[in-house]
Each structure stands twice: as structure tokens, then as C-alpha cells.
A protein has these predicted regions:
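Positively charged n-region of N-terminal signal peptides that target proteins for export
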Residues: 1-4
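C-terminal motif of bacterial Sec signal peptides marking the signal peptidase cleavage site
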Residues: 13-16
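Ser/Thr-rich, low-complexity intrinsically disordered terminal regions
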Residues: 18-127
Length: 127
């Protein structure tokens, strides 16, 4: 019985906690500590979200921006000045919605992920 309890506790630690927040623009954003990934659905087509993402990364002066995106899904990578890798995965959900996942570094960085997301969201809502 003790082994089962210890195993369940370990699984809980590995999976990590999930936190959710609603941005001022009304988007529900979740972040899983175990994965280090910020997830959300944005109102916008794949091309709109892709353009907003690339513009955001350029404005934040990230380097080595690489984009492999079509109208259904894609991946955008870049590096921060200190060498930390930023990975953004996009996937079209319906005709006017796009799923976005942002991971900063190996373990994830919630604060920087949220800052990138908010900039992307503002660009889309501004259009």
C-alpha cells in the first residue's frame, strides 16, 4: 500500500500543476508546470496568427527565427539573446480559431511565455 501511495505522489509531481488565467482580452490561457508549455486558442486564422507571432518575435528582438507553417499547422522557433530556445506550435482549429503552444527553454518559463502570448494576442485583437 505504501508503494502505491509513493508512486501516486511521484506521478503528481511529474505531471505538475496546471494554472489557468483569463487575459484582459478574454482569452483563456493555461500553463502546465510539468510540461512548461503555455496553451491557448486564439480567435484568428492560421495566417493571421502566424503573422502576429512572427511580428512579435521580431519586435522582441529574438534571433534565428525559423518558420515552418502552412494553413493547417506549423512550428516557429527562435532564440533569445541569452541563447534560450523559444518554440511556438500552431494548429488551425476550425476556420477562425488557432491553437497556440509556447515553450521557452527546456523546462519552460511561464512569465516569458505569457509576455510573448500577450503581444501576439494584442496584435490579433488590434487587426
Amino acid at each position: 500500500m505504501k508503494k502505491i501511495i509513493v508512486a501516486l505522489m511521484c506521478v503528481g509531481v511529474l505531471v505538475g500543476c496546471k494554472s489557468s488565467v483569463v487575459t484582459p482580452e478574454g482569452t483563456d490561457v493555461s500553463y502546465r508546470k510539468g510540461e512548461g508549455v503555455l496553451r491557448a486558442n486564439l480567435e484568428g486564422t492560421m495566417p493571421e496568427v502566424t503573422s502576429a507571432t512572427l511580428a512579435t518575435l521580431e519586435d522582441l528582438e529574438l534571433v534565428g527565427i525559423d518558420s515552418t507553417v502552412d494553413k493547417l499547422q506549423g512550428k516557429i522557433t527562435a532564440r533569445m539573446a541569452v541563447g534560450t530556445k523559444v518554440t511556438i506550435n500552431l494548429k488551425g482549429v476550425g476556420t477562425d480559431s488557432t491553437s497556440i503552444k509556447i515553450k521557452v527553454g527546456t523546462l519552460g518559463d511561464r512569465s516569458i511565455s505569457m509576455q510573448i502570448f500577450r503581444n501576439i494576442e494584442k496584435r490579433i485583437k488590434g487587426n
